Amino acid sequence: MQNITIINTRCANLSSVKFAFDRLGYHTEITDNIEKIQSADKLILPGVGTAKAAMQNLADLGLIEVIQSLTQPVLGICLGMQLMTDYSEEGNLDLLKLMSGKTEKLPDCQLPLPHMGWNKVHYAADHPLFAEIAQDSYFYFVHSYGVLPNPHTVATCDYGVPFSAVIQHNNFYGAQFHPERSGKAGALFLRNFVENIK
């Protein structure tokens, strides 16, 4: 059985992520222990709130360089995905720099912010994270900042303008939506991360 570890960023609804994996039959552990993080088979980097608070928490826990040096698959969720980029406009902040790109406030398109609720996700053909998930399936979003499409974009969503719904570089994967709150499609997405990503 794979060792799936949820990094305790102290700024996320960690229990809902854990329950999502529990429902799929996977054992997970929530921890900020460096040795456990480094020895995990798969890692989840969740986050809600501000980038500044999240980066400060990771710094206080001594986890920034630990995360940057990981070689196993890591899935960032919502703010956790944004933290994987170089920089955030929210607080003019350097982030984890796991892949190029920046996090910026979604443009004013006469739509309310935060972008909250169900929206369609369009993914690149044959990506293993989307195995058995219908094209343009709906996923659940809650965010005001996002990553505009770039070479690391695997899937997009549109909220007045297109933005990255999923990004990837090497072993680092990020989802702007909340798979743990996205019904059957979200459950399949988490299963695919565990089973299909090596």
Curated annotation (Swiss-Prot):
GO molecular function terms listed in the Swiss-Prot or TrEMBL record: glutaminase activity; imidazoleglycerol-phosphate synthase activity; lyase activity
Keyword DNA-binding tagged: no
Glutamine amidotransferase type-1 domain boundaries: 3-198
Keywords assigned: Amino-acid biosynthesis, Cytoplasm, Glutamine amidotransferase, Histidine biosynthesis, Hydrolase, Lyase
Active site: 78, 178, 180
Cellular component per GO, a single term: cytoplasm
Matching HAMAP family: HisH
Protein name from the UniProt record: Imidazole glycerol phosphate synthase subunit HisH
